[in-house]
Amino acid sequence: MTAPSMSRPDDVRPEVLDFKPYVPGLSIDEIRDRFGLADVVKLASNENPLGTSPVVQRTLKTKADLAFRYAQSGNPRLTRAIAAHHGVAPERVVAGNGSDEIIDLLIRVRATPGKHNIVAFRPCFSIYELQAKFCGLEFRQADLRPDFTFDWDAFLAATDENTAIAFVTTPDNPSGWCPPVSELEHVARTLPPSCLFVIDEAYMDFCGDEAAHSLLSRLDAFPNIAVLRTFSKSFGLAGLRLGYGILPERLADYLHRVRLPFSVNILAEEAGLAALEDTVFRSETLRVTAEGRAYIAEGLTALGCEVMPSWANFIMFRPPTDATDLFEALLRRGIIIRPLKSYGLPQHLRVSVGNADENRRFIEACKEILPHA
């Protein structure tokens, strides 16, 4: 008897057949091997310029013998610490294996295939679209304005009574744009009542003035808002995969019910607790990022690049020459940044803010490659 083929289209859900997976930035090892380089700088994935907090490193060493244990269900110590950090009720907080897990759970909990749609801007963080389509949902997008600010009229026009979730990232990725909080208030009040407004604030720590840009402190006035945050950026825990949502309490309860057990492992939880306590490291991260962002913006502008204003830990820019040529020339010099073709921006690039030496190497390499202004 012949074994059934696993390549038949009817063996998987239709949504999977043409599914395009998330494409991460190139790794240091890939570029070392490709070009035979000993020293490679990665400025592609918006990671912490200072690495990992020394307090977190000591905690991981001290707690390593707990690796055989399961974390406590729901990570109550961590959710209480996050709640205290933001001044919200612990019942609002759901921790996840990166904020990606919270995005996935929100879509699967709130949206019904064949009925609901999901709305976001174009371009946007690709996970919104990937998970919406994987769940068999219609995914709608509103274009940004030519200057990459948010066209809220187009965004609201894309929604209707069947919109389960409207996603916005602020500061935005890849542009770095961060709208004033008054605009978010207007949208929250104007969206259809049944629509959940999910504000992804992965980069909010870097904006400089959260009160002017975030609704997190005003959630009681907006029952249709969920806010996402991450430990990957200012806390320096990208490799441990730890994020969280601050949600309406009833919705948070549903997510706790359906999430996979122990998705936040015990060492990630201990690292998150330590990171919240290390305010010195976080403050230094924000200082280094602000200084580096200004240095990179000034350097690129002097080289004739069109530099987008940024409130995040990265800068999007358009070079005066072909973006792919610059990207590849930087790779040959051992510097990895992010091409934005996958975002529909083939002539733009995104560079993460690194430490002072990494930023200097990037600008010096650009000076060698780009025609002098």
UniProtKB/Swiss-Prot annotation:
Disulfide bonds: none annotated. It comes from the Bacteria. Its EC number is 2.6.1.9. SUPFAM superfamilies: PLP-dependent transferases. Pathway: Amino-acid biosynthesis; L-histidine biosynthesis; L-histidine from 5-phospho-alpha-D-ribose 1-diphosphate: step 7/9. Keywords: Amino-acid biosynthesis, Aminotransferase, Histidine biosynthesis, Pyridoxal phosphate, Transferase. Its cofactor is pyridoxal 5'-phosphate. InterPro entries: Aminotrans_II_pyridoxalP_BS (IPR001917), Aminotransferase_I/II_large (IPR004839), HisP_aminotrans (IPR005861), HistidinolP_aminotransfase (IPR050106), PyrdxlP-dep_Trfase (IPR015424), PyrdxlP-dep_Trfase_major (IPR015421), PyrdxlP-dep_Trfase_small (IPR015422). Pfam families: Aminotran_1_2. One of its GO terms (molecular function) is histidinol-phosphate transaminase activity. The keyword Membrane does not apply. The modification N6-(pyridoxal phosphate)lysine is found at K233. One of its GO terms (biological process) is L-histidine biosynthetic process. It catalyses: L-histidinol phosphate + 2-oxoglutarate = 3-(imidazol-4-yl)-2-oxopropyl phosphate + L-glutamate. Homodimer. Belongs to the class-II pyridoxal-phosphate-dependent aminotransferase family. Histidinol-phosphate aminotransferase subfamily. This is Histidinol-phosphate aminotransferase. It comes from Nitratidesulfovibrio vulgaris (strain ATCC 29579 / DSM 644 / CCUG 34227 / NCIMB 8303 / VKM B-1760 / Hildenborough) (Desulfovibrio vulgaris).
